[in-house]
Swiss-Prot record:
InterPro entries, per database record: Ribosomal_uS19, Ribosomal_uS19_bac-type, Ribosomal_uS19_CS, Ribosomal_uS19_SF
Domain of life assignment: Bacteria
Gene name as annotated: rpsS
NCBIfam families according to UniProt: rpsS_bact (TIGR01050)
Annotated PROSITE patterns: RIBOSOMAL_S19
Native source species: Nostoc sp. (strain PCC 7120 / SAG 25.82 / UTEX 2576)
Protein name per UniProt: Small ribosomal subunit protein uS19
Gene Ontology CC, one term: cytoplasm
Length: 92
């Protein structure tokens, strides 16, 4: 179940104000954020946002295809190291 249309998309206020400032000045800087739940809006396209994954900030370049998704979708929090190796060779 999605968010109500009358509410509009969620975006953290501090993140929105930083992006609007950069758009007014026509600047491109890396913006650090911990707000993984913020929705990507069209005014964010072209910016690089460093999204926190629990350990470090992962730089995410925003493209048009990402609009409508959440920032956290592009900064994975878990590292897959493969399934456990079988010990069949040791049992021979």
């Amino acid at each position: 179940m999605g968010r109500s249309l009358k509410k509009g998309p969620f975006i953290a206020d501090h993140l929105l104000s930083k992006i609007e400032k950069l758009n007014d000045r026509n600047e491109k800087q890396v913006i650090k954020t911990w707000s993984r739940a913020s929705t990507i809006l069209p005014l964010m396209v072209g910016h690089t946002i460093a999204v926190h994954n629990g350990r470090q900030h992962v730089p995410v370049f925003i493209s048009e295809q990402m609009v409508g998704h959440k920032l956290g979708e592009f900064a994975p929090t878990r590292t897959y190291r493969g399934h456990g190796k079988s010990d069949k060779k040791a049992g021979r």
